[in-house]
């Protein structure tokens, strides 16, 4: 069953008995029907769109893309995440029902990519916002790599215990790395923070040559002017 082995029942026996636990049954049902919420913001998402075609056929994994976070149990982030997007992404993750999983796809999502050095508005890794289960590096990763990431996530689901996962999330509520976010009043006003913008001096504030000379003359004391006048008069 897609690289995940389960004991098969003997269909020839009439009185077959299934011996399992509620946790194993729950894991089997969840890994066979992952419903992803597609959060694509950049070019990496184009590679995931290739899985929809008949060549890769991601329907065989039980993947059904959803447009509502309340109906999804997997969020796949692909592309750059900016500071302005961060609250929306966290809100989408919190609206997903438990248990929920995250796949970080691409270098820009995992580390910030080429925007991680000079950009002041890029989040250096989506794991600073939401907990990530599977990291998928690449720029962009191939569709085969995405299938491998989904397979690894299904293996993780098949072995986990739901109670342990909930305890781990309560103890380590995200974030092993300290981020440097600045709390603002609102991000949906449409106005930029003026402190980050360099304001060029206006033309009215640039003094002309006449104003400079006049300012210099005003700065000279009257005593100096009298002395200079007397000096020129003697000559």
Swiss-Prot record:
Organism, as annotated: Ipomoea purpurea
Role summary: NDH shuttles electrons from NAD(P)H:plastoquinone, via FMN and iron-sulfur (Fe-S) centers, to quinones in the photosynthetic chain and possibly in a chloroplast respiratory chain. The immediate electron acceptor for the enzyme in this species is believed to be plastoquinone. Couples the redox reaction to proton translocation, and thus conserves the redox energy in a proton gradient.
GO biological process, one term: electron transport coupled proton transport
Membrane topology according to the record: Peripheral membrane protein
EC number: 7.1.1.-
Co-factor note (free text): Binds 1 [4Fe-4S] cluster.
Gene3D superfamilies noted in UniProt: 3.40.50.12280
Reaction it catalyzes: a plastoquinone + NADH + (n+1) H(+)(in) = a plastoquinol + NAD(+) + n H(+)(out); a plastoquinone + NADPH + (n+1) H(+)(in) = a plastoquinol + NADP(+) + n H(+)(out)
Name of the protein in its database record: NAD(P)H-quinone oxidoreductase subunit K, chloroplastic
Family indicated by similarity: Belongs to the complex I 20 kDa subunit family.
GO MF, one annotated term: 4 iron, 4 sulfur cluster binding
Pfam family, one: Oxidored_q6
A cellular component term, taken from the record's GO annotations: respiratory chain complex I
PROSITE patterns, sorted: COMPLEX1_20K
Cofactor field: [4Fe-4S] cluster
Enzyme class: translocase
Keyword tRNA processing: no
Chain sites annotated for binding [4Fe-4S] cluster: 43-44, 108, 139
InterPro entries, sorted: NADH_UbQ_OxRdtase-like_20kDa (IPR006137), NADH_UQ_OxRdtase_20Kd_su (IPR006138)
Subunit structure: NDH is composed of at least 16 different subunits, 5 of which are encoded in the nucleus.
């Amino acid at each position: 069953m897609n690289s995940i082995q389960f004991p098969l029942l003997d269909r020839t026996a009439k009185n077959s008995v299934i011996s399992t636990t509620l946790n194993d049954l729950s894991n089997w049902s969840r890994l066979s029907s992952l419903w992803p919420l597609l959060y694509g913001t950049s070019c990496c998402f184009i590679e995931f769109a290739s899985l929809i075609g008949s060549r890769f056929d991601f329907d065989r994994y039980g993947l059904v893309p959803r447009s509502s976070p309340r109906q999804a149990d997997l969020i796949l982030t692909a592309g750059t995440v900016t500071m302005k997007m961060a609250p929306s992404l966290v809100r989408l993750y919190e609206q997903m029902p438990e248990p929920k999983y995250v796949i970080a796809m691409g270098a820009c999502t995992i580390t910030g990519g080429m925007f991680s050095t000079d950009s002041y508005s890029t989040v250096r890794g989506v794991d600073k916002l939401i907990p990530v289960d599977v990291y998928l590096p690449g720029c962009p990763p191939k569709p085969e790599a995405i299938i491998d990431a989904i397979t690894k996530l299904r293996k993780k689901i098949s072995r986990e215990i739901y109670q342990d996962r909930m305890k781990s999330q309560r103890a380590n509520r995200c974030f092993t790395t300290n981020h440097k976010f600045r709390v603002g009043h609102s991000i949906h006003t449409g106005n930029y923070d003026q402190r980050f913008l360099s304001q060029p001096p206006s033309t009215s504030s640039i003094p002309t040559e006449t104003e400079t000379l006049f300012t210099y003359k005003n700065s000279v004391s009257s005593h100096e002017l009298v002395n200079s006048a007397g000096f020129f008069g003697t000559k």
